[in-house]
Amino acid sequence: MSLIYISTGGYFDQNGIKSFDYLKNNKIKLVELSGGKYFKNFKKYLPKLKDNCQIHNYFPPSKNSFVLNLASKDPIISKKSFNLVKNNILYSKKINSKYYSFHAGFRVDPKPKELGKKFKIKKILSKTEAEEIFLKRLIKLNKLAKKNNIKLLIENNVINKKNLKSFQTNPLLLTTPNEILNFFKKLQYYKLDIGLLLDVAHLKVSSKTMGFNLQKAHKDLNKIITAYHLSDNDGLTDSNKKFSINSWFWKNLKKKVKFFTIEVYKTDYVGYLNLIKILKSKL
């Protein structure tokens, strides 16, 4: 059976290690480290994290926060993003994790507080240029990942109506099924063994914004899905709400994947244990 992780992403007001301890002390076996508050000396915690967790996207948080963007043209953000991913590949090896996942790139550089909200109008790269930058960095990072037996996973972005209206174009990469599939063909052309981490909640909001069929999109993407992020929402905002036994994504769920991460916010360990139970009943 696929592994089931719980994300620390919803615990905004404490650091990831405290969230890890809380979950582990309350019957949660596997934890995905994501977000949270800044803390010093992540390396000293690596031994206690061994065999119990994996790292996702922007973690450990930097003292001066930024948005991880592997398609950025900004020299400072580019360097910070590349180094964060590079370090996380090495950290993943040290904690015996087989995977490291991160978001697809952006055509703009949003501020951390803008994530999930309306971005302020900024200089925007062409889709072609942003994809080329993203791809070049993936080629370099994949070499390091392969050397350390880590498989990289790209998570689909979420586009809401506010940002589409503001920019009059989609400022994010990999939000629609066609774009995701076409980009993964390029990865295959360059022989990059990189998988898709499908965030079903992101797909739901993007479907409503961009007007594509949600169930068909999920079905079409099945062939490249390696793992899932699970939560639910109203289709307008990526709110990380609880899913239920009747949630939309069960219909075309790919059951044989490497792992599922429950990325639900504002719940306690009892809520997570119930969500694990629902997920297991569907597998």
Regions found by a protein language model. Name each.
Residues 30-34, 54, 101, 153, ...:
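Conserved beta-strand positions in the central sheet of alpha/beta enzyme cores
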Residues 44-45, 166, 209-210:
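Short amphipathic alpha-helical segments
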Residues 10-12, 35-39, 57-61, 104-108, ...:
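Active-site-proximal loop/turn and secondary-structure-junction residues that shape catalytic pockets
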Residues 63-71, 161-165, 236-238:
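A short acidic, helix-capping loop that chelates divalent metal ions and anchors anionic groups
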Residues 49-50, 71-74, 118-119, 171-172, ...:
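Short, hinge-like loop/turn segments at secondary-structure boundaries
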